[in-house]
Amino acid sequence: MSDINATRLPIWGIGCDPCVGDEVTALLTRGEA
């Protein structure tokens, strides 16, 4: 289990970074504004 999780985490982070980053940026922008 740990091996699978350790392998999936980096891939998920890199693969979904753009879409997740956009959502986070939007939330941060709205919060700061």
Curated annotation (Swiss-Prot):
There is a cross-link at residues 11-18 (Cyclopeptide (Ile-Pro)). The keyword Signal does not apply. Keywords: Thioether bond, Toxin. Processed by the macrocyclase-peptidase enzyme POPB to yield a toxic cyclic decapeptide. POPB first removes 10 residues from the N-terminus. Conformational trapping of the remaining peptide forces the enzyme to release this intermediate rather than proceed to macrocyclization. The enzyme rebinds the remaining peptide in a different conformation and catalyzes macrocyclization of the N-terminal 8 residues. It comes from the Eukaryota. InterPro entries: Amanitin/phalloidin. There is a cross-link at residues 12-16 (2'-cysteinyl-6'-hydroxytryptophan sulfoxide (Trp-Cys)). Residues 1-10, 19-33 form a propeptide. It holds the Pfam family Amanitin. GO terms for molecular function: toxin activity. The keyword Ribosomal protein does not apply. Toxin belonging to the bicyclic octapeptides amatoxins that acts by binding non-competitively to RNA polymerase II and greatly slowing the elongation of transcripts from target promoters. Belongs to the MSDIN fungal toxin family. The typical symptoms of amatoxin poisoning are gastro-intestinal distress beginning 6-12 hours after ingestion, a remission phase lasting 12-24 hours, and progressive loss of liver function culminating in death within 3-5 days. One of the few effective treatments is liver transplantation. This is Beta-amanitin proprotein. It comes from Amanita fuligineoides.
